[in-house]
Amino acid sequence: MRRSSLGKRLFVSPSCNGFLFPISWFCNEQFLNLEKLRTMFRMSVEIVKHFQARNLSEESQSYIRTHAKRYAFLLEKVSMLAAGLNQRPPITFLDIGPSFFTELLRVSFPQDKIMTLGYDFPESRGGHFPMDTAHDNRQHFHFNLNDAQFPDRYISTPPADIAIMAEVIEHLYTAPTLVLRFVRTLIRSGGFLIVETPNPASLKKRLKLLWGKHPYEMIRENVENPGHFREYTKGELCAIAKSAGFEVSGCELSNYFSHDSSKASILRLLRSHGPSSLRRGITMILRKPV
């Protein structure tokens, strides 16, 4: 336990590995209700099972197996923030870049408002969000985040209590500070933004470079789904977030991508005994100041 600069007592949740939350968050009725509600997606195996009955392509099934642990990790962070808002439903969520996670969010928070923002082109769909996946167009706001460099093209949405931008920022060619400045306009004062993105300095990528292999994917020949343009380190993301007008509430590096291979098992073992800077994913919680 420690005390923040605001004088609140803070509890370091063991399951949150270093994220700081006011201890009152764990005692309010909203948190207890969320804990009772979200019992189905605590483990990655439950997420894989949830989608098993679907007639999904092998690409989509592989994507779910790879990202199920990340989805469970992200849902835990979302639940903690939702509990900390200490307000009755509906909470307004904005999922930037809809995916399978959007469905998990809707199932986990049935009383709340789930909005989405981003592309809705067939070309932009892929293993992460196939065309036959259900999508509520009534709560979807179409916007190309690369247009964040043009303030006259900004759109508005109902202000979000919690926005989620998971595995999105690395797909954009527009400067990330401009993107986050736009996203900031979609969040209410005191609201939160969760950013998830791959760690460009992970152990696997360092080893690839050491072996003379390029650690990053070639940009694809698909303007609507080009792959990764740029990945950002923890230090870069902190600086970008502050420049965009956010407060950094927490940051964690974690190994939440699952790959079934002997090489992956060896890398997992090495990462588990190395510094956190070698882990594969970065999750950052940002707050819009009041």
Predicted regions and their residues:
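Short catalytic micro-motifs in class I SAM-dependent methyltransferases
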Residues: 166-171
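Conserved class I S-adenosyl-L-methionine
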Residues: 88-99
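Conserved SAM-binding motif I beta-strand of class I
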Residues: 113-119
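Conserved SAM-binding loop of SAM-dependent methyltransferases across substrates and taxa
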Residues: 100-111
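Glycine-rich helix-loop-beta junction characteristic of Rossmann-like nucleotide cofactor-binding loops
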Residues: 76-87
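S-adenosyl-L-methionine-dependent methyltransferase catalytic module, highlighting the catalytic core
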Residues: 33, 37, 41-77, 100, ...
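Glycine-rich phosphate-binding loop signature in dinucleotide/nucleotide-binding domains
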Residues: 85-88, 154-158
